[in-house]
């Protein structure tokens, strides 16, 4: 579809299907105004969604509770009969209901509420940015262990990290952790090479020197980091592959076909020099055509499976080291990703997910992530969603779901259209929420839904009913009005830091990159922050003034009702730059700036210690 197509009238037949397909003809934006998507957008979205198979929606029930629709023969997913009274929810789990009419439905039996966190505080950290002296140019899982251990010693209950989803093993390495190659597998850049089993059996001194040398500047060079770490992993693999521990063999076997496909995709990307799988030879553009290739490259496929095991072990160690790790789940995956390759039949590549203009982003956003077809997701028994959640909860004690509206609806923007020219598509909310309750209940994990921006009516009420915390971030006085059932923060990765706000450098950055913003309002926020901190907004702003402002802001957060409050390591380190500037590509070093000093130093500095005291005094 081209931009000129969007203004054309929609075929009448297409508009008739909108309600049935869960595509609203209008929506209420963040300012309370009713917006109507372009008619050609609605028609194109309807055509894409209706291309999926016709299936029955999943049936959600609760263990031991009456369920009138639970009539028929119940089996487990392997087809074995499940005994029990008809019309009563079975034990928590997934089942198939074979109805008297000959149909089959997925049954999700889940607890009625999610586990809950205690009142407390924690650190928010962009893991890639949290380098230590021993890092190889990027924060790693050993650094995460340092952070969680330090956090627990300081009295923190949690550590929220940026997504650690997998990236493609070829240049250019994707900078954004929110645009992954797979949400099921892990980012190999976060492997701490010194902690890899067998690292002591090979000489890595040359690679280590080069890796640590990357810590000399704040810019993170992922391609260079990957070149060095891949070389180190290859040396260790060559020395250990013939006598790998039984734990490795058991783990790889347990991951089964999913891991085999991901590792095969990695080798295909290496072989053809690109992760854009639609540019590969036709026979390899689909997993079914890659079986012979995988057999021919069995050692390399095994290498990538082993590397995932290494990453998984290290993440598990970090998650057990101290405070509860809150894993972050991205909205989707890159169109050239392993997940897109694996699940391509259910991916709508002619669209990208985004959000309409709101008070945080006046131009709206396009995230470059193709949406899953909700009809195809139901037909697949939600397997892509289930495996993603299970992977995230393998070690983490809590989840943050970025853009929690992904469980209700997503804003589909046609390729080539502006961010404001999209339309919403609804998803099977009750089933996806039940999956979350089931998987979180199995591990005792609590869940946070990032519900900022444009949020549909009734969403927050549903979150509260099931025990999902919301997310609030604000530098302004309304932090005092945060509700209790939320995770509260001063800002998100897309917003200004305290130092950037107080100095005014964030406004300068916005102007430099050409971003639309209400600069009068932003100046008001700056002056309000200065007043609360007892700082002259028109005087010189240096380290002392920033120190005062950081403590003043977090005193406000400490006193708010939010169940869990977060202090960012960016604020503890007085970082002025945003981690990410939405709507920019080359104009800003998105996701590429490390913290200005080693993370172990930042955690030991007076500001971090004082922040811990302020937040630790929460009643």
Feature locations, PLM:
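Basic helix-extension-helix modules of the SAP/HeH family
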Residues: 2-49
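Structured C-terminal cap/extension of enzyme domains
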Residues: 574-619
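A generic structural signal for well-ordered alpha-helical segments
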Residues: 18, 151, 318-322, 440, ...
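Beta-sheet entry/capping signal
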Residues: 94, 104-106, 120-122, 148-150, ...
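Extracellular ectodomain segments of secreted/surface proteins
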Residues: 41-82
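Extended acidic/polar, glycine-enriched regions
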Residues: 72-120, 130, 136-148, 153-154, ...
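Short, polar loop/linker segments at the starts of domains and inter-domain junctions
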Residues: 33-34, 134-142, 280-283, 503-507
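Alpha-amylase-like alpha-glycosidases and glucanotransferases acting on alpha-linked glucans and related
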Residues: 170-312, 316, 332-566, 570-572, ...
């Amino acid at each position: 579809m081209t931009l000129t197509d969007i203004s054309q009238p929609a075929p009448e037949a297409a508009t008739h299907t909108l309600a049935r397909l869960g595509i609203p003809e209008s929506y209420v934006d963040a300012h309370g105004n009713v917006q109507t998507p372009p008619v050609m957008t609605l028609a194109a979205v309807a055509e894409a969604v209706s291309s999926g198979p016709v299936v029955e929606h999943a049936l959600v029930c609760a263990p031991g509770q009456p369920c009138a629709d639970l009539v028929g023969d119940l089996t487990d997913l392997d087809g074995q009969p499940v005994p029990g009274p008809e019309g009563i929810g079975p034990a928590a789990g997934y089942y198939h209901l074979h109805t008297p009419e000959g149909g089959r439905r997925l049954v999700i039996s889940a607890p009625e509420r999610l586990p809950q966190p205690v009142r407390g505080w924690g650190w928010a950290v962009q893991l890639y940015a949290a380098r230590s002296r021993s890092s190889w140019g990027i924060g790693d899982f050993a650094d995460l262990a340092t952070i969680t251990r330090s956090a627990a010693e300081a009295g923190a209950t949690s550590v929220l990290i940026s997504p650690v989803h997998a990236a493609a093993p070829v240049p250019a390495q994707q900078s954004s952790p929110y645009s992954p190659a797979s949400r099921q597998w892990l980012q190999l850049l976060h492997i701490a090479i010194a902690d890899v089993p067998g690292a002591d059996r090979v000489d890595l001194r040359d690679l280590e020197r080069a890796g640590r040398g990357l810590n000399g500047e704040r810019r993170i060079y992922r391609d260079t980091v990957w070149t060095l770490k891949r070389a180190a992993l290859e040396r260790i693999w060559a020395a250990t592959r013939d006598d790998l521990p039984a734990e490795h063999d058991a783990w790889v076997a347990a991951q089964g076909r999913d891991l085999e496909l991901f590792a095969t995709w990695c080798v295909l990307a290496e072989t053809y020099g690109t992760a854009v799988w639609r540019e590969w030879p036709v026979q390899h553009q689909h997993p079914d055509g890659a079986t012979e290739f995988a057999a021919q490259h069995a050692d390399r496929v095994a290498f990538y499976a082993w590397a995932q095991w290494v990453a998984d072990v290290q993440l598990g160690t970090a998650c057990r080291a101290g405070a509860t790790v809150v894993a972050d789940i991205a909205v989707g995956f890159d169109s050239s990703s392993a997940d897109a390759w694996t699940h391509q039949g259910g991916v709508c590549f002619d669209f990208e997910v985004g959000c309409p203009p709101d008070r945080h982003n006046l131009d709206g956003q396009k995230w470059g992530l193709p949406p899953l077809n909700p009809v195809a997701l139901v037909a697949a028994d939600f397997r892509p969603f289930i495996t993603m959640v299970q992977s995230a909860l393998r070690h983490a004690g809590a989840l943050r779901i970025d853009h929690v509206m992904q469980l209700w609806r997503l804003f589909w923007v046609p390729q080539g259209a502006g961010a404001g020219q999209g339309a919403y598509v609804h998803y099977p909310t009750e089933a996806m929420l039940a999956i979350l309750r089931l998987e979180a209940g199995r591990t005792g994990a609590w869940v946070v839904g990032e519900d900022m921006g444009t949020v549909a009516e009734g969403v927050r009420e549903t979150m509260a009913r099931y025990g999902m915390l919301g997310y609030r971030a604000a530098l302004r006085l309304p932090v005092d009005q945060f509700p209790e059932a939320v995770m509260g923060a001063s800002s998100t990765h897309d917003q200004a830091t305290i130092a950037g706000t107080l100095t005014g450098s964030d406004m300068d950055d916005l102007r430099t990159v050409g971003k639309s913003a209400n600069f009068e309002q932003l100046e008001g926020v700056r002056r309000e922050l200065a007043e609360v901190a007892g700082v002259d907004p028109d005087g010189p702003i240096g380290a002392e003034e920033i120190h005062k402002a950081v403590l003043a802001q977090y005193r406000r957060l400490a006193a708010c009702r939010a169940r869990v409050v977060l202090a960012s390591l960016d604020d503890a380190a007085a970082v002025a730059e945003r981690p990410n500037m939405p709507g920019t590509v080359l104009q800003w070093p998105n996701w590429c700036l490390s913290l200005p000093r080693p993370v172990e130093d930042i955690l030991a500095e007076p500001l971090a210690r004082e922040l811990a005291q302020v937040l630790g005094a929460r009643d």
